[in-house]
């Protein structure tokens, strides 16, 4: 789904299409009407059968619903409170906070690396001591 | 007006026209065109027949010779709603004109009014675009910050757990010391007649003590 601004612009364009289609379709399907006090003596022109639907009502509903949708989308737009200065200061504050959290993350990673080195050194000492004990035991057995 | 005078195309050329300028041979012979310099502070430049000013990102309605229907200081949402309602009223007026007097010049005036309303609405909505871009950037930075904080917290938790495991392993070591003492006792009883090996009896205990000292130093 698109963002709200794009939805709103699409709805406005759709409303314009509804305007054009309403006038075009109603004009196309309209019936000829008789002039007052101007009737022919001869046989009347046969009137075509009326259309099944009421296009005027249909387009009226479409246009009204579209206008209501536009109002709803306009209501969802942000207020003027979040102005450019507020946004810029918020962006700068976020940048500073991001740099701070990046430094914190680096410090934690460095602590982890130090602990890893200590553990590796401890394991190395343990292995060395075990090797020394094995050598000593061999000497004792001999 | 400017389009009719200068006949500027409204779209860029297809990419092949630009790619052909940057073949390896052209680059080697220094024939490839360089990127244009950035415009100066108040320079007005033309892009596809439309004049752009560097100060304002979106051209105002006055500079486009379009009548402005909204005041200078306004509430955008209220003005947009007014324009929306004006659209409906103007459309109803247009229908009345079509019913009563289809050939009057006021019909075309009404159509122009409706077009003007649509242009103003779209302009107001497009003025929200820079705000939207900044808001999107702010949301991205918020997500980045939250990710970093969560990653640091998770790493710290793992670090504490590793320290606990190491301390637990270290606190379990005295049991080995007791076992070693009993083992030493066994060795003493076995090699008691041979006095020449008395010096060798100290070696395993000495090695074990050295290992413990190194471990304590490393952890602390």
From Swiss-Prot, chain A:
Q: Which residues form a coiled coil?
A: 87-111
The protein here is known as: Mediator of RNA polymerase II transcription subunit 21
Q: Does the keyword Transcription apply?
A: yes
> What's the source species for this entry?
Drosophila melanogaster
Extract the InterPro entries matched here.
Med7/Med21-like (IPR037212), Mediator_Med21 (IPR021384)
- What does the protein in this record do? Component of the Mediator complex, a coactivator involved in the regulated transcription of nearly all RNA polymerase II-dependent genes. Mediator functions as a bridge to convey information from gene-specific regulatory proteins to the basal RNA polymerase II transcription machinery. Mediator is recruited to promoters by direct interactions with regulatory proteins and serves as a scaffold for the assembly of a functional preinitiation complex with RNA polymerase II and the general transcription factors. Required for activated transcription of the MtnA, MtnB and MtnD genes.
BP term (GO), one = regulation of transcription by RNA polymerase II
> Can you name one GO molecular function term for this protein?
transcription coregulator activity
SUPFAM superfamilies associated with the record: Mediator hinge subcomplex-like
Known partners and oligomeric status: Component of the Mediator complex, which includes at least MED4, MED6, MED14, MED17, MED18, MED20, MED21, MED23, MED24, MED27, MED30 and MED31. Also interacts with MED7 and MED10.
The protein's location, in the record's own words, is: Nucleus
Q: What is its main location?
A: nucleus
UniProtKB/Swiss-Prot annotation, chain B:
Record keywords, A-Z: Activator, Nucleus, Transcription, Transcription regulation
- Signal peptide position in this chain? none
What is the annotated localization of this protein?
Nucleus
Principal subcellular localization: nucleus
Q: Name one GO cellular component term.
A: core mediator complex
> Do you know which Pfam families this protein is assigned to?
Med7
GO molecular function terms noted in the UniProt entry: transcription coregulator activity
Mention one GO biological process in which this protein takes part, according to its record.
regulation of transcription by RNA polymerase II
Record-stated family: Belongs to the Mediator complex subunit 7 family.
Q: What does this protein do?
A: Component of the Mediator complex, a coactivator involved in the regulated transcription of nearly all RNA polymerase II-dependent genes. Mediator functions as a bridge to convey information from gene-specific regulatory proteins to the basal RNA polymerase II transcription machinery. Mediator is recruited to promoters by direct interactions with regulatory proteins and serves as a scaffold for the assembly of a functional preinitiation complex with RNA polymerase II and the general transcription factors. Required for activated transcription of the MtnA, MtnB and MtnD genes.
Record's subunit section? Component of the Mediator complex. Interacts with MED21.
- UniProt-recorded name of the protein: Mediator of RNA polymerase II transcription subunit 7
Q: Give the organism the record lists.
A: Drosophila melanogaster
**What is the gene name?**
MED7
């Amino acid at each position: 789904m698109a963002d709200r601004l794009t939805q709103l612009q699409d709805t406005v364009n759709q409303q314009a299409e509804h305007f054009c289609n309403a006038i075009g379709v109603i004009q196309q399907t309209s019936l000829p009407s008789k002039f007052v006090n101007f009737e022919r003596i001869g046989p009347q022109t046969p009137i075509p059968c009326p259309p099944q639907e009421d296009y005027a009502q249909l387009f009226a509903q479409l246009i009204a619903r579209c206008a209501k949708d536009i109002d709803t989308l306009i209501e969802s737009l942000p207020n003027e409170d979040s102005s450019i200065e507020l946004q810029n200061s918020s962006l700068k504050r976020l940048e500073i906070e991001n740099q701070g959290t990046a430094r914190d993350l680096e410090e934690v990673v460095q602590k982890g690396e130090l602990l890893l080195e200590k553990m590796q050194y401890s394991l190395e000492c343990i292995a060395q001591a075990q090797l020394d004990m094995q050598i000593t035991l061999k000497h004792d057995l001999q | 007006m400017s389009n009719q005078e200068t006949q500027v195309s409204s779209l860029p050329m297809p990419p092949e026209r630009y790619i052909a300028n940057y073949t390896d041979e052209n680059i080697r012979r220094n024939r490839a065109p360089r990127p244009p310099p950035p415009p100066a502070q108040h320079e007005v430049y033309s892009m596809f027949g439309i004049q752009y000013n560097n100060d304002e990102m979106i051209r105002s309605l006055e500079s486009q010779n379009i009548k402005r229907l909204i005041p200078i200081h306004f509430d955008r949402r209220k003005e947009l709603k007014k324009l929306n309602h004006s659209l409906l009223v103007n459309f109803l007026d247009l229908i009345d004109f079509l019913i009563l007097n289809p050939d009057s010049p006021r019909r075309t005036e009404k159509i122009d009014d409706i077009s003007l309303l649509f242009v103003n609405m779209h302009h107001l909505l497009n003025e929200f675009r820079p705000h939207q871009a900044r808001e999107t950037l702010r949301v991205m930075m918020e997500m980045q910050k939250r990710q970093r904080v969560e990653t640091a917290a998770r790493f710290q938790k793992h670090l504490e757990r590793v320290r606990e495991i190491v301390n637990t392993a270290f606190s379990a070591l005295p049991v080995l010391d007791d076992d070693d003492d009993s083992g030493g006792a066994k060795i003493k009883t076995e090699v008691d007649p041979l006095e020449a090996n008395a010096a060798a009896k100290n070696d395993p205990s000495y090695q074990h003590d050295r290992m413990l000292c190194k471990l304590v130093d490393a952890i602390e």
